[in-house]
Amino acid sequence: MLTWETPVMLASNTASTKKLAFITTFLIIVLCPVTMVMSQPQADVLPLPASDADCLLRFKDTLVNASFISSWDPSISPCKRNSENWFGVLCVTGNVWGLQLEGMGLTGKLDLEPLAAIKNLRTLSFMNNKFNGSMPSVKNFGALKSLYLSNNRFTGEIPADAFDGMHHLKKLLLANNAFRGSIPSSLAYLPMLLELRLNGNQFHGEIPYFKQKDLKLASFENNDLEGPIPESLSNMDPVSFSGNKNLCGPPLSPCSSDSGSSPDLPSSPTEKNKNQSFFIIAIVLIVIGIILMIISLVVCILHTRRRKSLSAYPSAGQDRTEKYNYDQSTDKDKAADSVTSYTSRRGAVPDQNKLLFLQDDIQRFDLQDLLRASAEVLGSGSFGSSYKTGINSGQMLVVKRYKHMNNVGRDEFHEHMRRLGRLKHPNLLPIVAYYYRREEKLLIAEFMPNRSLASHLHANHSVDQPGLDWPTRLKIIQGVAKGLGYLFNELTTLTIPHGHLKSSNVVLDESFEPLLTDYALRPVMNSEQSHNLMISYKSPEYSLKGHLTKKTDVWCLGVLILELLTGRFPENYLSQGYDANMSLVTWVSNMVKEKKTGDVFDKEMTGKKNCKAEMLNLLKIGLSCCEEDEERRMEMRDAVEKIERLKEGEFDNDFASTTHNVFASRLIDDDDFGFAMNR
């Protein structure tokens, strides 16, 4: 057999050599013209790419008052893995991923060109500064995903083609500047745009036709816009179009007959250039297709020949296959054993063993550590289930499993988690790490020994386990107010910075210091589930008017105050929407009107003799925060200030005078505050 096989193989090799020579000649003939076209001289010498640090330092030189960022030291790298050495620089895997210089009083014109060479740059934020002049050029930032320029002093018209080529841009915030002229038509051609805020400017004319199907939020209020609202935006919140010259059509009132129809889809400013490029692109694609077909043919020939040569050795091939199958099954058995305890409680196992950490001061662990650890079910809330678990280091953690975030994209979710990871406040429970999978998300935080405020307010109490006394409750609500005030200052672009404030989302540490949880999750929640489950959507303004405002979180704070003072669970939280008949606010108001104010307070709440007036003050704040008309409702900053001013056993006459008018309608009178305080 060998004497016959050897000549056959040699002949085959000779034939293969001829075929490959023919294919090579053909490829040279086909590719030479393409190579000649693509190799036209672009520049005599290509400059060496600048480092990220060089780009940042050149950008710093363009700033008028850059003393705020003195930490930008040329001798130190801007990034160290996922942590930042330079203030305001955001890093991912050791590369500059973003720049966040917000609220620093920066002035002058904003020149972004020095940053264009940072290849991994994905987000820029210069909100709440004093930059002036025209809109900075962003045409060289094709990979940018988010641009935040709100609350500055930019002026002038934005060119129609200002955003051409920004095919990855998802979020653009230009609110509260002084831009004028028409809305740039190139915005309508950003394929991945999710959020657009143009409110608080001087744009005029008609709104262009936005054809993006995934556009979730578009804000045009307080401009000089007129004409019909494009049909593609008809499902937006009506508030997004308020304060304009003469806009009409859904979701606003219908247009009159002379208002014209919805504006046509605008022509792209670069459509002519694109058409000219289509012909060249088509030729290149055809050539590439031919090349791929040839390569595929060669691969098939070689693969067939290899199979024929291997068929002479069936026993060896069988041994290899059996060994592979054995190893694979063994690995599956090991994986199944390691996650049995987890799957029995949590369901499906995440398919990538990678946790992303947001805090640097915590010992690292991986997903397998969590899978192997025993866990205690803490509860099943509206968003998902919570588990208490401990890792090898002895640290106790809470793992929250969220099921209603599967509509958010991977990049958008990562960006929002990094934003939450930068929040630092004594009354916020920081997210230690998180895990992303499309079907579900895991958020990991430190376990708090005294659990939630709800467990203390609504659990069965005894002599050994009494209810919370008044000083502790005051301490808790003051901490909650401080945490909310911080969220309002840091998350200015969110309509509802918390969005899901309730007693079960306030946890207590070993000294009963409160920490807020589940904050700022609305941007990554599925729309349908957030409407049905989040506390903000049970507010009067959403049920009666169909919108949320900054004061929606104030309403949630007011209900929490009343829950803390009365010890009663807000039953309206169990129903969908707002039901005044089931509202805790209605019950408290009726008790006050009936001169039964003393019966409102939780009888298990002990305190000093002279704390009655202070408790009444907090009750007044709570009711003021719960005004059904949000225009009459207290501002968050005022509520935080008044709560912080409360001191045990003291009465503030100035505060009482400022709130007299608000509560006169509810017949609250200081003299009526008669009840037996437990001692």
Swiss-Prot record:
Entries under PROSITE patterns matching the protein: PROTEIN_KINASE_DOM (PS50011)
Biased composition (Low complexity): 252-269
Residues that span the membrane, as ranges: 278-298
Gene3D superfamilies: Phosphorylase Kinase, domain 1, Ribonuclease Inhibitor, Transferase(Phosphotransferase) domain 1
Enzyme nomenclature, EC number: 2.7.11.1
The reaction(s) this protein catalyses: L-seryl-[protein] + ATP = O-phospho-L-seryl-[protein] + ADP + H(+); L-threonyl-[protein] + ATP = O-phospho-L-threonyl-[protein] + ADP + H(+)
GO molecular function: ATP binding; protein serine kinase activity; protein serine/threonine kinase activity
Assembly description: Interacts in vitro with ROPGEF1 (via PRONE domain). Interacts weakly with the GRI peptide.
Domain notes: The protein kinase domain may be catalytically impaired due to the lack of the conserved Asp active site at position 500, which is replaced by a His residue.
Protein name: Pollen receptor-like kinase 4
Source species: Arabidopsis thaliana
